[in-house]
């Protein structure tokens, strides 16, 4: 992604910091949660992060790695705009993706690796393709 594209994505997200869902059903598990839905739906106007993730993902084709997926809000944001040729690796040390549905969990493009020890070189090399590790 070049600098001009990145600036455009950031600008568009600033002017409309809400996810434009491709599949609104992905957010069904969080829709009635009065704590976390504030963040993903940006109900107070202070949480455009998930919209930015969504917008960035829609402009990327390849492997996406998310570090820290607590509750799964980032996974929802990324998955909704994940291209058919892309993969998502989402890693956390805590196994809590309560808002991620079975459709996402069973998608072969999605790899949710919780309780992941990033310092274990054997696990890292076994999980990722050799050329993708830098």
Listing of model-derived features with the role each one plays in the protein:
Residues 1-134:
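A short alpha-helical cap/connector motif
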